[in-house]
């Protein structure tokens, strides 16, 4: 059973590499544009493969159109990849938009913004303390 898992994982990795090459080099559909294959999850019986993709665009409508274009071309993409891989059965491809990368970048930007705001507040607060300490030092020297 463990051997089946490792075989499906190896097939998924090879399928990911082949799909990335086919989508970059062989697809001429302008609706798809630049696409990145993040991961491939192959079913145990090798009948289906979920292909997780991301695009350069973040607009939901454009992303949905691109996924639909990939789904429409899935049979053609499958035949191109089948010619490159030595499998008895080529899995049926299902393209899924992977929003985790976009969400991760958004969260990273939020954290960076909070850190820079916090540093600015600390610097401003530190400058105010320096001014109040220097005025206290001057008033002590006058006594």
UniProtKB/Swiss-Prot annotation:
Species in which this protein is naturally found: Shewanella sediminis (strain HAW-EB3)
The reply to whether Transport figures as a keyword in the UniProt entry is no
Q: Where is this region: Disordered?
A: 116-143
Q: What is this protein called?
A: Ribosome-binding factor A
Its GO CC terms are: cytosol
What residue spans carry the Basic and acidic residues bias annotation? Answer: 116-128
Q: Which GO MF terms are attached to this record?
A: ribosomal small subunit binding
- Role according to the record: One of several proteins that assist in the late maturation steps of the functional core of the 30S ribosomal subunit. Associates with free 30S ribosomal subunits (but not with 30S subunits that are part of 70S ribosomes or polysomes). Required for efficient processing of 16S rRNA. May interact with the 5'-terminal helix region of 16S rRNA.
A GO biological process held by the record: maturation of SSU-rRNA
Ligase keyword on record: no
Key words of the record: Cytoplasm, Ribosome biogenesis
Entries under InterPro entries matching the protein: KH_dom-like_a/b, RbfA, RbfA_dom_sf, Ribosome-bd_factorA_CS
Report quaternary structure and partners.
Answer: Monomer. Binds 30S ribosomal subunits, but not 50S ribosomal subunits or 70S ribosomes.
Cellular compartments annotated:
Cytoplasm
Question: Of which family is this protein a member?
Answer: Belongs to the RbfA family.
